[in-house]
Amino acid sequence: MSTVYTRPLARLVEQLQRLPGIGPKSAQRLALHLLKRPTAEVEALANALIEAKQQVGFCSVCFHLSADPVCDICRAPSRDKTVICVVADSRDVIALEKTREFKGQYHVLGGLISPMDGIGPDQLNVQPLIRRVHQTKTQEVILAINPSVEGETTTLYVGQLLKPFTRVTRIAFGLPMGGDLEYADEVTLARALEGRRDLD
């Protein structure tokens, strides 16, 4: 690390750079901003980070982020338990929930099949999804997975496993190939949910 920074500041910049989307300049800007803030404010941020890391885990049913063994969505009696929307990541659950269109439940795979990265079906929450479909009265599984090469591979794999047991659909996309659900606006996501179709 450059001698421009004192050692504690250099460590802070280095740690901030580990965050996704944060390059050297952004890390420096954030570090300098934090140092200008009152100590109580910085301590509150540090405590919130530690508390979230210690208390937030994964729902035992759908694998979405949760501070409880079963998340609020899975516990909610108003949710349609016969429809499961399968997503790659909790960020996708958050994006879809913002549309206020989907009233069913979710299942978070925890990633996508990517042989280049050493991620196969066994590293994802695929088997718990299959068990869940078998054990519940699931009438439809909606595959809401990003339209990337890895996303298509995952969609086809999961779809083929589930088609013998339930209706499998995928959302229609107003996104280009390689686009991410997380960055789509609410209207695009809402239309994608409405325009879902059966998986061929």
UniProtKB/Swiss-Prot annotation:
Keywords attached to this entry: DNA damage, DNA recombination, DNA repair, Metal-binding, Zinc, Zinc-finger
SMART domains (alphabetical): HhH1, TOPRIM
Zn-finger region bounds: C4-type: 59-74
Superkingdom field: Bacteria
Secretion signal span: none
Role played: May play a role in DNA repair. It seems to be involved in an RecBC-independent recombinational process of DNA repair. It may act with RecF and RecO.
Protein name: Recombination protein RecR
Organism of origin: Acaryochloris marina (strain MBIC 11017)
Organism ancestry: Bacteria, Bacillati, Cyanobacteriota, Cyanophyceae, Acaryochloridales
